[in-house]
Amino acid sequence: VDSEKIAWVLTNLLSNAIHYTPENGRIIIGARQQDHSVEIYVQDFGKGIDPRYHQSIFDRYFRVPGTKVQGSGLGLAISKDFVEAHGGTLSVDSAVGKGSTFVIKFNV
């Protein structure tokens, strides 16, 4: 495992959570073991992502329409590539107005 790449992914997910969470908002970072896998998650309580964009946000250069936060649209695509190169998955669970949870999952 390339720990630097996984650290980069976590830093990117945390940075996104900070940018999309209102001032004094809450962000949760955690890990849990599920049967034969380990999950690391970053959860925010920001504006959330419309479900129709849940797959597209992992595409290079994609930006959710109306997003005001600066960015290149590369962070999540690169994060997904790094995680998948290590045999894992990166997914999102999000609803508009309720925030987002990004989950990195590795089989153990």
How would you name each of these model-derived features?
Residues 1:
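Conserved micro-motifs of the catalytic ATP-binding
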Residues 17-18:
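Short helix-loop "hinge" at the ATP-lid/N-box region of the Bergerat-fold HATPase_c
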Residues 75, 79:
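Short alpha-helical Gxxx[C/S/T] motif in the catalytic ATP-binding
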